[in-house]
Amino acid sequence: MINVSTEFRNEMTQDDNRNFIPYAEITLADGTVLNLTEKEIWQESFKIEDATSASGTFTIGAAVATKLTFTINNIYDTYSAYDFDGASIAARVGLTLADGTTEKLLVGYYTVTEPSYDGTTITLVCLDRMSKFNKAYSASTLTYPATLQTILQQACTDCGVPLLTTTFDNGSYSVATKPESDSLTYADIVACVAQIAGKFAKIDNNGYLYLGWYDFSIFEKNANLDGGSFDSASPYATGDTADGGNFTDYSSGATADGGTFYDQKYYHECYLKV
């Protein structure tokens, strides 16, 4: 979750103010630092793809890297001489508030994995620190048996990723022997730990690994109808009932108030995750 000011939240409720301003602080492999803004970043090219489950399915224990993509304006060959491969990026987005100031939000730390040069433009595909776990687990020197908590902590230490979640469900569960496979990576280990904990694994905007799950309490904030479950009764016995009324008197039937559009911020979380 990204904390923002009340003013930022208020601006997010205005339909005419969703013009986020991109910022990228790029540190090249040779130490050169480039600070890019909307003047250098191609319009509407700044995109972040995030997920807590595998594509096209619902998974427990997903450890999906967040991808940042943006295009740099290079019409005048300003950046042609720079090597962006492996560069580190601190990405931010800003929003202009009612008082004219700009509030900037840190949306993550990334590493350039696929730079492409097209003469007038340079496109950078970047992954967050979850990508640091993409190396062989055979390098681990951790002594087994080991608890899930110890396994996760050691994986973060070995891969240089700070850990935010130090305690979690089933964290004391002990694994008897070290998993052995030539294809096994630290990312696989992180995913396995998350699955046994009943969580997903993510990198937050500050670059820390955490285990989390979905907040279902938001669905109780308004007078919503519960659809129940596919129980064995016929007709289904669970869930709320609502009378649809009749076509003679359209005012007949049950009503349910789903709240206001402002209430929907809890579902979309547009101002929390960008």
Per-segment meaning from a language model:
Residues 1-143, 178-183, 187-198, 203-205, ...:
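Assembly/oligomerization scaffold segments
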Residues 96-101, 154-159, 234:
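Extracellular beta-strand-rich, repetitive "passenger/adhesive" scaffolds
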Residues 101, 167-189, 195-196, 203-221, ...:
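C-terminal extracytoplasmic interaction modules
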Residues 115, 129, 212-214, 233, ...:
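Small disulfide-bonded, cysteine-rich extracellular recognition modules and tandem repeats
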Residues 134-137, 152-182:
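N-terminal export/assembly leaders
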Residues 148-153, 187-190:
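Extracytoplasmic/secreted envelope proteins and their assembly/folding machinery
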Residues 221-267:
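Intrinsically disordered, compositionally biased repeat/linker segments
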